[in-house]
């Protein structure tokens, strides 16, 4: 699969999947054994999506156009979430995503800031 197509598919599925809390659709984008580091300077967290989606009442997000070089894409995104404890969270970030030849994610490193 072409990296540009894979990256756009990744962004589209994440945007819909985050809004709908569809962890299955999102995890289907990743190759078995893929590295996904959700926060810099922290170890990857198994079960991250399930934990985060359980803490969110609703979310709205937007993913930008991927910037692609070889098998790597950088994708900017923003999200506004309403948490189950009544709080809100506004995030702005970029995901650096490396794709395998089959178009599945083999490595992802996320960087974000809470506004």
Where are these regions (language model features)?
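A general structural signal for well-ordered secondary-structure junctions
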Residues: 24, 36, 58-59
């Amino acid at each position: 699969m072409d990296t540009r197509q894979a990256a756009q598919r990744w962004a589209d599925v994440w945007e819909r999947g985050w809004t709908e809390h569809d962890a299955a659709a999102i995890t289907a984008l990743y190759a078995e054994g893929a590295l996904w580091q959700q926060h810099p300077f922290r170890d990857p967290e198994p079960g991250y999506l399930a934990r985060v989606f359980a803490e969110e009442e609703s979310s709205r997000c937007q993913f930008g156009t991927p910037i692609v070089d070889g098998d790597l894409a950088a994708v900017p995104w923003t999200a506004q979430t309403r948490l189950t404890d009544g709080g809100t969270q506004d995030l702005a970030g970029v995901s650096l995503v490396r794709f395998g030849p089959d178009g599945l994610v083999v490595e992802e490193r996320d960087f974000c800031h809470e506004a």
